[in-house]
Amino acid sequence: FLEGIVEKKTGKLRLSLSLSKKGKTARVNSLETPRLSQYIGKLNVILFSPEDLSLVKGSPAVRRRFIDMEFGQIDAVYLYELTRYRTILRDRNVYLKQLQTKQSTDRVYLEVLTEQLAKSGAKIILKRLEFLKELENYAKILHADITQQKENLTFKYKCTASIDDLEMNQGAIEIRLKETFETIVDKEIFQGTTLIGPHRDDVSFKVNGRNVQTYGSQGQQRTTALAVKLAEIDLMRAKTGEYPVLLLDDVLSELDGERQTHLLKAIQDKVQTFLTTPGLNDIARQLIKQPRLFRINAGKIEVRPETIDRKSTRL
């Protein structure tokens, strides 16, 4: 069980989340929310952990999850459409399996599901393109600052249905999705699964025109990941009018001194930050000028003095 009070411009909110064998229960001001999707966005949070450094070199699923998690916090329409898309996708995959195993031979229902999926998918793709363009604008500035103006960062949305030649509007994307589904329907029935759509799309990051995932050094990959994560902070503030809460989960030990400095510069005196670390060696002095220290020992949380013994590396 976790509970806290969030102070926003619109007032205070008491948020709680409990986990039991029956599932998760979320409450806002002691009132249970019927769906967890209605809870998301009440407190905007950005998590930065060592795993996020694999945002660039990880699998497409990692980058899709990043988009859905971060964008879903600030756009309720996107979150709703994403939930709807997943429901239709699940139904379509079930029916494709039935066609594959000859449990059904009627393709009319498949056409209905395909039309619904294309319409919902087009909305998601358009929203993602808009989100990534805004995020790119912030990330470019941060990335150029970190690299001392030597490198230029750009994003590229990689759609499984080619849309590069289209005008970016929902209708055009929807038509292209339908056309692509028509050309691969037999292959989808043979494999028993949906082969194209937002659930299979990807994002690539390019530095000076070269794919940093394929051709970038480890330093370039980490700089790109850092710029993208820091850009989230500015984008969330622009969209919501408030800074998010930042969670740094043992990530500073993974960054060199220069990247730590840029991280601190981006959050100093602006963002409420919770940082976890096994010791203090990897934390820059300027980050902990006025800290509140907590030590977790055997599952218990102890409040520590707000002064740090620099001779010791232990909390």
Question: Where are these predicted regions, by residue range?
Answer:
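A conserved P-loop NTPase coupling/switch region
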Residues: 38-42, 50-115, 119, 290, ...
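A short, compositionally biased
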Residues: 1-2, 18-23, 198-203, 288-290
